[in-house]
């Protein structure tokens, strides 16, 4: 079963989204940072009309839809890769999921606290992405250190080290692993290492009700960013 982690800065609407997705979910969603400490988890069935039609054609008595587990993860702040806030907990929870749903605040409301004191969705995205990049960079450097002695005697270790050097250069420039063009063989190696920025990501914009139909300037910026990154919004 696919596991998707709902992430973002504190107090941007992660638990609200979780409650909307998961039937009978009662995750605490309050107007203050770090409302969520322990991750909330819930399983959602994915409706698919094609599955129902196939079941009808085959007279199946038992139709089981695909399911996704959503994990509402504690908010991340600057310095999370170094353990700030709930950083270590946040990063370990993200390592356990298959995909990331990044919630971004795209509405103005003086009564709703923003940890940065201002609404700037692209800045919010940069904070999260930078921390994930830094966490990957730290993990990569530790991995290279561990295999350093094997490089001269093992072709596999040497091949991995060359790949890691290539990825390290990209991460240092702020480029996520998912954005790097890799061969099928290289992707297999990377998958085993579990880099955070290699996980597929969807940006979920949190809008006022009045902007739900057409979006606003904030959500347009997020959509453009996602398009340039070849991700979904």
Task: For every predicted segment, state its role.
Residues 1-113:
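Conserved G1/Walker A P-loop phosphate-binding module
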Residues 2-7, 12, 18, 146-233:
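C-terminal-of-GTPase-core extension/linker across diverse P-loop GTPases
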């Amino acid at each position: 079963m696919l596991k998707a982690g709902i992430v973002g800065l504190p107090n941007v609407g992660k638990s609200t989204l979780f409650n909307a997705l998961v039937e009978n979910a009662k995750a605490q969603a309050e107007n203050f940072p770090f409302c969520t400490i322990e991750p909330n988890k819930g399983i959602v069935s994915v409706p698919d009309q094609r599955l129902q039609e196939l079941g009808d054609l085959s007279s199946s008595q038992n139709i089981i839809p695909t399911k996704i587990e959503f994990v509402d993860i504690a908010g991340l702040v600057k310095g999370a890769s170094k353990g700030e806030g709930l950083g270590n907990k946040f990063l370990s929870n993200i390592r356990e999921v298959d995909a990331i749903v990044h919630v971004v605040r795209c509405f103005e409301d003086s009564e709703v606290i923003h940890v940065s004191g201002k609404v700037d969705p692209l800045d919010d995205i940069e904070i999260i992405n930078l921390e994930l990049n830094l966490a990957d960079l730290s993990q990569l450097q530790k991995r290279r250190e561990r295999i350093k002695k094997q490089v001269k005697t093992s072709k596999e270790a040497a091949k991995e080290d060359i790949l890691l050097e290539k990825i390290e250069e990209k991460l240092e420039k702020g480029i996520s692993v998912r954005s790097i063009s890799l061969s099928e063989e290289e992707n297999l190696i990377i998958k085993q290492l579990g880099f955070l920025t290699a996980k597929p990501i969807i940006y979920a914009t949190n809008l006022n009700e009045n902007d739900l139909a057409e979006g606003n300037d904030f959500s347009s910026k997020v959509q453009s960013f996602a398009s340039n990154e070849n991700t979904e919004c």
